[in-house]
Amino acid sequence: MGVVDGYWDSSGRADRLSGGSRRIPIDTPSGRFSVWTKRVGNNSDLKVLLLHGGPGATHEYLEACDSYLPAAGVEYYYYDQLGSGFSDQPDDPSLWQLDRFVDEVEQVRAALGLGPDNFVLYGQSWGGLLAIMFEMTSPFSCA
Protein backbone atom coordinates (compact mmCIF):
# COMPACT_ATOMS: atom_id res chain seq x y z
CA MET A 1 0.00 0.00 0.00
CA GLY A 2 1.48 3.36 -1.01
CA VAL A 3 1.68 6.49 1.10
CA VAL A 4 -1.39 7.99 -0.55
CA ASP A 5 -3.36 4.76 -0.14
CA GLY A 6 -2.46 4.54 3.53
CA TYR A 7 -3.37 8.17 4.11
CA TRP A 8 -6.90 7.69 2.84
CA ASP A 9 -7.40 4.20 4.34
CA SER A 10 -10.14 4.34 6.98
CA SER A 11 -10.57 0.60 7.48
CA GLY A 12 -10.75 -0.24 11.14
CA ARG A 13 -11.69 3.34 12.08
CA ALA A 14 -14.96 3.85 13.98
CA ASP A 15 -15.84 6.78 11.71
CA ARG A 16 -15.21 4.97 8.40
CA LEU A 17 -18.90 4.80 7.44
CA SER A 18 -19.54 8.49 8.15
CA GLY A 19 -16.76 9.93 6.02
CA GLY A 20 -14.76 10.76 9.14
CA SER A 21 -17.57 12.68 10.89
CA ARG A 22 -18.59 12.03 14.45
CA ARG A 23 -20.32 13.80 17.31
CA ILE A 24 -18.52 14.02 20.62
CA PRO A 25 -20.40 14.44 23.90
CA ILE A 26 -19.11 17.25 26.10
CA ASP A 27 -20.04 18.07 29.66
CA THR A 28 -20.79 21.68 30.58
CA PRO A 29 -22.16 23.40 33.71
CA SER A 30 -25.55 23.38 31.90
CA GLY A 31 -25.52 19.68 31.05
CA ARG A 32 -24.29 17.41 28.29
CA PHE A 33 -24.24 18.50 24.66
CA SER A 34 -22.49 17.24 21.55
CA VAL A 35 -20.07 18.84 19.13
CA TRP A 36 -19.34 17.86 15.54
CA THR A 37 -15.91 16.77 14.31
CA LYS A 38 -14.60 15.37 11.06
CA ARG A 39 -11.33 13.52 10.56
CA VAL A 40 -9.47 13.80 7.26
CA GLY A 41 -6.59 11.45 6.53
CA ASN A 42 -4.73 8.86 8.53
CA ASN A 43 -1.36 9.58 10.16
CA SER A 44 -0.52 8.31 13.62
CA ASP A 45 2.50 10.63 13.87
CA LEU A 46 0.92 14.02 13.14
CA LYS A 47 -2.63 15.11 13.94
CA VAL A 48 -3.93 18.69 13.82
CA LEU A 49 -7.08 19.93 15.55
CA LEU A 50 -8.37 23.01 13.72
CA LEU A 51 -9.98 25.71 15.90
CA HIS A 52 -12.18 28.19 14.03
CA GLY A 53 -12.77 31.83 14.88
CA GLY A 54 -15.80 33.43 16.40
CA PRO A 55 -17.00 32.43 18.80
CA GLY A 56 -19.92 31.38 16.69
CA ALA A 57 -18.17 30.98 13.33
CA THR A 58 -17.89 27.50 11.78
CA HIS A 59 -15.20 25.16 10.50
CA GLU A 60 -16.17 25.83 6.87
CA TYR A 61 -13.60 28.51 6.03
CA LEU A 62 -10.87 26.17 7.30
CA GLU A 63 -11.77 23.72 4.53
CA ALA A 64 -9.05 25.53 2.57
CA CYS A 65 -6.76 23.12 4.45
CA ASP A 66 -8.02 20.43 2.06
CA SER A 67 -5.81 22.08 -0.56
CA TYR A 68 -2.51 21.37 1.20
CA LEU A 69 -2.67 19.20 4.35
CA PRO A 70 -3.45 15.93 2.51
CA ALA A 71 -0.45 16.45 0.21
CA ALA A 72 1.70 16.81 3.34
CA GLY A 73 0.25 13.61 4.82
CA VAL A 74 -1.21 15.41 7.84
CA GLU A 75 -4.23 13.90 9.61
CA TYR A 76 -6.50 16.75 10.67
CA TYR A 77 -9.80 17.33 12.38
CA TYR A 78 -12.46 19.90 11.66
CA TYR A 79 -14.48 20.80 14.73
CA ASP A 80 -17.47 23.09 15.25
CA GLN A 81 -17.40 24.48 18.76
CA LEU A 82 -20.55 24.35 20.88
CA GLY A 83 -23.05 26.90 19.56
CA SER A 84 -21.75 26.85 16.00
CA GLY A 85 -22.16 24.98 12.73
CA PHE A 86 -23.19 21.33 13.04
CA SER A 87 -22.74 21.26 16.84
CA ASP A 88 -25.52 21.64 19.40
CA GLN A 89 -26.86 25.18 19.80
CA PRO A 90 -27.85 25.58 23.46
CA ASP A 91 -29.77 28.72 24.35
CA ASP A 92 -27.68 29.54 27.41
CA PRO A 93 -25.50 32.69 27.43
CA SER A 94 -23.62 31.44 30.52
CA LEU A 95 -21.86 28.88 28.30
CA TRP A 96 -20.04 31.62 26.36
CA GLN A 97 -17.06 31.73 28.73
CA LEU A 98 -13.42 31.39 27.67
CA ASP A 99 -12.58 28.82 30.36
CA ARG A 100 -15.55 26.68 29.36
CA PHE A 101 -14.47 26.68 25.71
CA VAL A 102 -10.91 25.72 26.72
CA ASP A 103 -12.34 22.82 28.74
CA GLU A 104 -14.38 21.85 25.67
CA VAL A 105 -11.20 21.71 23.57
CA GLU A 106 -9.68 19.37 26.18
CA GLN A 107 -12.75 17.11 26.09
CA VAL A 108 -12.61 16.99 22.28
CA ARG A 109 -8.85 16.29 22.35
CA ALA A 110 -9.33 13.42 24.79
CA ALA A 111 -12.27 11.92 22.86
CA LEU A 112 -10.26 11.99 19.62
CA GLY A 113 -7.28 10.33 21.31
CA LEU A 114 -4.89 13.16 20.52
CA GLY A 115 -1.84 12.96 22.75
CA PRO A 116 1.23 15.07 23.49
CA ASP A 117 3.40 13.13 21.03
CA ASN A 118 1.24 13.55 17.94
CA PHE A 119 -1.00 16.58 18.48
CA VAL A 120 -0.91 20.13 17.14
CA LEU A 121 -3.52 22.85 17.60
CA TYR A 122 -4.12 25.28 14.76
CA GLY A 123 -6.28 28.21 15.79
CA GLN A 124 -7.39 31.25 13.83
CA SER A 125 -8.66 34.42 15.55
CA TRP A 126 -10.81 33.25 18.50
CA GLY A 127 -9.46 29.75 17.82
CA GLY A 128 -5.94 31.11 18.24
CA LEU A 129 -6.88 32.46 21.65
CA LEU A 130 -8.32 29.06 22.59
CA ALA A 131 -5.09 27.38 21.44
CA ILE A 132 -2.97 29.75 23.55
CA MET A 133 -5.17 29.31 26.63
CA PHE A 134 -5.19 25.53 26.13
CA GLU A 135 -1.39 25.51 25.97
CA MET A 136 -1.18 27.57 29.16
CA THR A 137 -3.54 25.34 31.15
CA SER A 138 -3.06 21.88 29.62
CA PRO A 139 -1.41 19.11 31.62
CA PHE A 140 0.84 18.59 28.59
CA SER A 141 2.17 20.85 25.91
CA CYS A 142 1.17 20.31 22.31
CA ALA A 143 3.67 20.88 19.51
Cite the ranges covered by each PLM segment:
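N-terminal type II signal-anchor transmembrane helix
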Residues: 1-6
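N-terminal cap/lid segment of alpha/beta-hydrolase-fold proteins
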Residues: 9-34, 39
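Tryptophan-centric aromatic hotspots in well-structured domains and transmembrane helices
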Residues: 18-20, 78-79, 126
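Conserved HGGG/HGGXW glycine-rich cap/lid loop of the alpha/beta-hydrolase fold
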Residues: 28-89
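Structured segments of extracytoplasmic/periplasmic soluble domains
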Residues: 68, 108-111, 137
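Active-site loop/oxyanion-hole signature of alpha/beta-hydrolase fold enzymes
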Residues: 84-122, 126
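Conserved hydrolase catalytic core segment
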Residues: 116-143
